[in-house]
């Protein structure tokens, strides 16, 4: 479909693969949560509010992780923060398998969320700063495509491993990235443009936070914060509840895992088409079009009743939603200069994670009060449309532009 010159460079290929695999592990952990909570709801007899609280706890940790890891990465380096966040979420995930109570499990998932929330924006900034401008968006979307690999892995683990060895096996597998961090320590380096600005690393943290709200960057910051909030709100509200919603629609737990696996496979072509279009038609085109199509498929999924209709709607939902995520991760670092790029990206992601906190808990609260599934998904339709409008009206096109220093 397209030829990417940057990936003909061995160094760039190694960077994309190294950061991508860490990204895949993150996605696997998030995906496993959606399957584990469906099993725990039955085994521990959790209420809908507890299910919502559990999935929200992870996002609360991600709020803190994204906010502070981005700023720390601007001071201490992208590589160092990437490694520490990877180790943190791996350790917390492994220990989650030993949790004997709901409260302990929630506490451990909070720390896992801190690591997850910190790793993602730092990894996208690292890759964005390391490849040529003409292919930067495409390469970052391909980085995001590893997320689909992680979700596919989580669905396979849920379908083949967890029914035999229990939900604890999912968390134990989630501890494997700790071993991968040893490899990352020698396989990646901070981007040259970051190393060249050593004198600006010790700038006070508060000044970095304020920098994203100066007159030059305020419009972009407002747009990004709206975009991130609406996308994360809708994603975590819909996808973390997918297996549970399938069960509520009358399918068995194992059958729901099978259907979600099929839907998850659609994420890969979603990323690949977004990677093609993002350098051909621009960031705004990809984000607006993919978000609006996500909104339409959300309405269809919420109202679908038959297995065929649910799977078809779920495939469209996965295809366009994850393609939009790829565009968002490519677009965000491009709107800030090197000295506070990771801070700006992290703060936008952190604000978005607030949506990830609210949505799963809100879904549980609404369902407990007999609000219908179609009505819940109309809420996500509205959220996604707001995000698309923010990009269309406030966004600045960055296709082909060099990153600001």
Residue spans of the language-model regions?
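Cytosolic juxtamembrane N-terminal segment immediately preceding the first transmembrane helix
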Residues: 1-28, 42
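Extracellular/periplasmic helix-loop-helix junction of adjacent transmembrane segments
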Residues: 34-64
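Helix-breaking motifs and short loop linkers at transmembrane-helix boundaries and internal kinks
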Residues: 45, 77, 98-104, 132, ...
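Conserved MFS/SLC helix-loop-helix module at the cytosolic interface between two early adjacent transmembrane helices
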Residues: 64-102
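Helix-loop-helix hairpin linking two adjacent transmembrane segments in secondary transporters
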Residues: 143-186
